[in-house]
């Protein structure tokens, strides 16, 4: 999250006239992230997040806000979009689509342990199953076609070795995406960006037997219909990684994957192609971080991410493919 479009007190007052949320108590920009303009909004009725969409169009937005509503109705803890006075879930602010959603309980866990990975794995599988009957379709907009368009734009900014890796991995992924194995992988709505800063944890209730409690997943604005295994790979590549080296942390990865498959067991095809999908998940974020780093947009409070982090992860996944754990109950 970031702030590309500033919102004055007068702007906010006019915007809030379309909502039955009481009086504004506090309003401030959120500095993290790189895609939309985001603000914490506190009113006399509760805590919310206002998002101005910098790239998504009004025609694309119903997929995202309706998906959150759908998941919330199916018991998945996600932000619920707040309806305006005309019943719609988003409007226009400074000529761009904008929406208000409820703020989830809890705080991000930026140094996750095994117990956090168990919670995330189980809920990710529940989210995938809950989305099976979601009627709208929107492809993952940061998948293979976007990689093909973006790699030539960033190629002038990287070393010869990096360019060879970018182009070689693009060819590898194109072949993977064209395979019968890929076509047969289970699919549906995916978060596509479930990093550790896009989930919140709250204090566990006493006597539940759990040391942590997942407050929910948020920031669904990179979501799209994709292979569920891609969503799992993106999640594992962030939650279960040794930050200095990019290597997988075996204990956390095993915990997350076993927890996931207690809800939705992996297919034989998913097991066979896990290594390729880990590489796809790493490649997607290396490409996007290179693009955001070398071709940034003007923004207030923008903090671009280090592209080198996902380059290290990609190289690690190429060298060490890994395997999905065998099916048995998660401890």
Swiss-Prot record:
Keyword hit for Acyltransferase: no
Pathway linked to the protein: Amino-acid biosynthesis; L-threonine biosynthesis; L-threonine from L-aspartate: step 4/5
Highest taxon, organism lineage: Bacteria
Record InterPro entries: Aminoglycoside_PTrfase, Homoserine_kinase_II, Kinase-like_dom_sf, Pseudomonas-type_ThrB
Listed EC numbers: 2.7.1.39
GO terms for MF: ATP binding; homoserine kinase activity
Alphabetical list of Pfam families matching this protein: APH
Any one GO biological process: threonine biosynthetic process
Enzyme superclass (EC): transferase
Reactions catalysed: L-homoserine + ATP = O-phospho-L-homoserine + ADP + H(+)
Protein keywords: Amino-acid biosynthesis, ATP-binding, Kinase, Nucleotide-binding, Threonine biosynthesis, Transferase
Family indicated by similarity: Belongs to the pseudomonas-type ThrB family.
PANTHER family: AMINOGLYCOSIDE PHOSPHOTRANSFERASE DOMAIN-CONTAINING PROTEIN, AMINOGLYCOSIDE PHOSPHOTRANSFERASE DOMAIN-CONTAINING PROTEIN-RELATED
Protein name: Homoserine kinase
């Amino acid at each position: 999250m970031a702030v590309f479009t500033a919102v004055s007190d007068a702007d906010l007052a006019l915007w809030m006239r379309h909502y039955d949320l009481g009086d504004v108590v506090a309003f401030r920009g959120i500095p993290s992230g790189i895609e939309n303009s985001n603000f914490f909004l506190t009113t006399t009725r509760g805590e919310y997040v206002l998002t101005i969409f910098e790239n998504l169009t009004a025609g694309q937005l119903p997929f995202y806000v309706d998906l959150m509503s759908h998941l919330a109705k199916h018991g998945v803890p996600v932000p619920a979009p707040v309806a305006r006075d005309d019943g719609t879930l988003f409007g226009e602010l400074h000529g761009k689509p904008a929406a208000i959603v409820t703020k989830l309980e809890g705080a991000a866990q930026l140094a996750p342990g095994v117990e956090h990975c168990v919670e995330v794995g189980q809920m990710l599988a529940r989210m995938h199953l809950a989305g099976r009957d979601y009627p709208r379709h929107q492809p993952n907009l940061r998948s293979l076609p976007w990689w093909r368009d973006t790699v030539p734009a960033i190629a002038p900014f990287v070393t010869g070795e990096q360019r060879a890796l970018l182009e070689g991995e693009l060819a590898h992924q194109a072949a993977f995406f064209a395979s019968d194995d890929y076509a047969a992988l289970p699919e549906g709505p995916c978060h596509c960006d479930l990093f550790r800063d896009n989930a919140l944890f709250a204090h566990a209730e006493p006597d539940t037997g759990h040391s942590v409690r997942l407050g929910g997943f948020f920031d669904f604005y990179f979501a799209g219909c994709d292979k569920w295994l891609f969503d799992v790979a993106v999640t594992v590549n962030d939650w279960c990684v040794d930050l200095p080296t990019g290597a997988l942390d075996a204990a956390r990865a095993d915990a997350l994957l076993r927890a996931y498959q207690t809800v939705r067991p992996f297919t034989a095809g998913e097991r066979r192609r896990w290594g390729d999908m880990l590489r796809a998940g790493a490649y997607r974020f290396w490409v996007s971080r290179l693009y955001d780093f070398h071709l940034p947009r003007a923004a207030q409070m923008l903090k671009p991410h280090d592209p080198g982090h996902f380059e290290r992860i990609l190289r690690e996944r190429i060298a060490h493919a890994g395997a999905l754990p065998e099916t048995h109950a998660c401890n």
